[in-house]
Amino acid sequence: MVLNKEIVLIHGTWCDGNVWGEFATGLRQMGYKVHTPSFRYHDLPYQECLAKVGTVTLQDYRDDLVALIESLDQPPLILGHSLGCLVAQMVAEKTEVAGMILMGPAPTADIFAFYPTMLACFGKHFLRWGFWKKAMPPYKKEFFKYCMNEQEESLKEEVFADLVPESGKVYTQMALHWFDKTKAAYVDFSRISCPVIVISGTKDKMTHPNIARRTAKNYRDSVLVSLTGADHMYESGKFQQKTLKVIKGWSQQNGFVD
């Protein structure tokens, strides 16, 4: 039995480390020691984040997490959600990790991502002059319709109330990666040899299920699981327990927990 195995949770767009809530509790009950960091400035109050986050880069997110991971006693698992999956892969390219859990992954640069629902969700930001250096505020209508489309209204309101702005620079590096001279969203998959599980949902409109399928194909030691009826919010609400069950089974199979 592996006791207190370290796992670092990497949240997605507009969120912070507090988003995990009962999901993190479920991982602790499996035997994991859970870390829930926030992306740079995402732990600040809304207006402070708005003023500072616009020009933060993908490399900033990666480097902050690499520093945390390398401070731990052992290489941890890393669990990413959405944008956090892209950052997780960037992290795993730079430092040793025991395994990766990727839920509704955002695309690395090699993967097509211009699906209609994704354009509808984020397109508004790219119509603003200076989008590449402006913070991207959470858009309520789009968040409800494309991220939490299968969830209860009360949960939608609860989650949205805690969201903060996202980096416009990060989204430019990810969505328009051919303009990024630093090639931040390009990942050398040959440098990552740990076991990987990719989790998707049949009703995920924020990151199309095809992206999850392509992500899994980039790794030799990978498993792809599709949750029937699940939207993008795997860690909350209706699909939380199903997601935890999948993670527990994979964790046991790989000897991470008993």
Positions of the model-derived regions?
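Conserved alpha/beta-hydrolase "acid-adjacent" motif
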Residues: 205-211
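Conserved alpha/beta-hydrolase
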Residues: 28-49
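Active-site glycine-rich loops that stabilize anionic/oxyanionic intermediates
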Residues: 12-15, 82, 202
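Alpha/beta-hydrolase
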Residues: 134-187, 194
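Catalytic active-site module of serine/aspartate enzymes centered on a nucleophile-bearing elbow/loop
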Residues: 222-258
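Short beta-strand/loop motif that positions the catalytic acidic residue
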Residues: 192, 198-200, 204
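Gly/Ala-rich beta-loop-alpha elbow adjacent to hydrolase catalytic centers
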Residues: 79-84, 88
